[in-house]
């Protein structure tokens, strides 16, 4: 545990204040579950292949981020099994599809793919002669 900020006391629910966890192993629950909140887990890796293996060794795949020289980061991003991979930033473009891989969900929201998810198609056949 590296950093935690003092915030108002929360008395019910499952919440954690903004925090950075170090010395995290990929087998730990905190590394394997989807955590929605201001939480960062630091997992060390030997090389890029090891980093990609760690990133892909989860049941989920909603968001990922890669930081480094642009072309190298893009090459790594292509190898990560995630619905969204941010490269050297974490913007959100509402015109882009948003959704996960694996147990992070099927389907997309946003962009053309998101509209298709919420569109019900119908085929009409008219063989009557007037």
Describe each region flagged by the PLM.
Residues 1-4, 86:
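A short linear hydrophobic-aromatic micro-motif
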Residues 8, 15-130:
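Conserved C-terminal structural/oligomerization subdomain of aldehyde/semialdehyde dehydrogenase
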Residues 4-10:
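Short, solvent-exposed loop/turn elements at beta->coil junctions and helix N-caps
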């Amino acid at each position: 545990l590296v950093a935690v900020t003092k915030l108002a006391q929360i008395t019910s629910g499952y919440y954690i204040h903004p925090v950075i966890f170090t010395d995290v192993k990929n087998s730990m629950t905190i590394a394997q579950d989807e955590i929605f909140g201001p939480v960062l887990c630091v997992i060390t890796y030997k090389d890029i292949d090891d980093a990609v293996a760690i990133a892909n060794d989860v049941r989920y795949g909603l968001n990922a981020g890669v930081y480094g020289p642009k072309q190298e980061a893009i090459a790594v991003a292509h190898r990560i099994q995630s619905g969204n991979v941010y490269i050297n930033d974490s913007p959100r473009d509402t015109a882009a599809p948003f959704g996960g891989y694996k147990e992070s969900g099927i389907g997309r929201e946003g962009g053309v793919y998101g509209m298709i998810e919420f569109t019900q198609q119908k085929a009409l056949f008219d063989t009557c002669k007037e």
